[in-house]
Amino acid sequence: MTKVTIVGAGKYGSTTALRVAESDLASEVVMTDIIEGLPQGLALDINQSRYVEKYETKVIGTNDYSQTEGSEVVVITAGLPRKPGMSRMDLLSVNAAIVEEVTREIVKYSSNPKIIVVTNLSLIHISE
């Protein structure tokens, strides 16, 4: 089966991890984030519902990209929200840097994964 990585454990990332797990589209979902402890706690919550909701997919929370090794699909939900006074170009620059860094880290551990970017549409070309 497929290994799926979700980068970003915020609202979009954690919901994506839950939905992929519930649908049994993958044998393993790895959720990673820069906030220490966040993806681990969310993974525990999702895993606790496995037996009640009757799905087999295991969810792993981590802050270490090496645990994403062998991912066939990567969903990038990481990014910062627009802050008051921030222009769209400033937001683009910040989030483009995040997507570039995430992509560099992912390809260190997974060869030729399918990458899905869930963020501002203007960032899609960054991950190519």
Q: In which residue ranges do the predicted regions lie?
A:
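N-terminal Rossmann-fold NAD(P) dinucleotide-binding loop
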Residues: 13-14
